[in-house]
């Protein structure tokens, strides 16, 4: 079963999977800033719908197992917080959905620290990298190998193009999982507008050389030919303008 690209008409399906996968995520709890579970789920749903749609516009959204798992990617030189993406995706509406503290956490703390840290860690490679923004599998579908199918197609592209992959992990127990796939811990950052700091672990996967890839016995995940061609076009287009990020 190969991963498939998510189209705009299915953005709500993709968002629902991520809401289920990240329902107890400490960063999501921190950003939504509410103790009402019904309100929390509503805010999470709206937040992920905006974020998924922004990635459909500017990046790449993959699903596997009939939306059992979802991964959100930004290719070289792209991001979701330019004005075009904010307006088209509806992300601006979060300013009116979150309370005053939630707005400060999301727009004044969360987005800036993510952008600044990524630029600081990757340096001149910031516009020459892939960004794994979110990857999640529905709680009822875990343990079926969906994670590998959601990330390895981009691994293969990055190995061919010599590009690193960057991510932030919001759960400490995820580090060994990502390390299994070749990511290396770099540093931790913290969201600090609460009594207890919320950590995020920065990790990078460097591209494998051809000889190392040939020696690897792990099976390679695949996409359909149509989707693979589409991703290849995105990579080529991003690299062509990688020195000038889309904004």
Curated annotation (Swiss-Prot):
- Specify the enzyme's EC class, one word: transferase
- Its predominant location is endoplasmic reticulum
Query: What are the alphabetically sorted keywords of the record?
Result: Acyltransferase, Endoplasmic reticulum, Golgi apparatus, Transferase, Vacuole
Q: Where is the N-acetyltransferase domain?
A: 70-205
Q: Which residues form a coiled coil?
A: none
- Location in the cell: Endoplasmic reticulum; Golgi apparatus; Vacuole
The EC number(s) given in the record are: 2.3.1.-
Keyword Chaperone listed? The answer is no
| One cellular component term from this protein's GO annotations in UniProt | endoplasmic reticulum
Gene3D superfamilies, per the entry: 3.40.630.30
Q: Which InterPro entries does the annotation name?
A: Acyl_CoA_acyltransferase, GNAT_dom, Trichothecene_AcTrans
The entry lists its GO molecular-function terms as: N-acetyltransferase activity
Q: Which family does it belong to?
A: Belongs to the acetyltransferase family.
Protein name, UniProt field: Uncharacterized N-acetyltransferase C550.08
User: Per the UniProt entry, what species is this protein from, by scientific name?
Assistant: Schizosaccharomyces pombe (strain 972 / ATCC 24843) (Fission yeast)
Which lineage is the organism of this entry classified under, starting from the top rank? Eukaryota, Fungi, Dikarya, Ascomycota, Taphrinomycotina
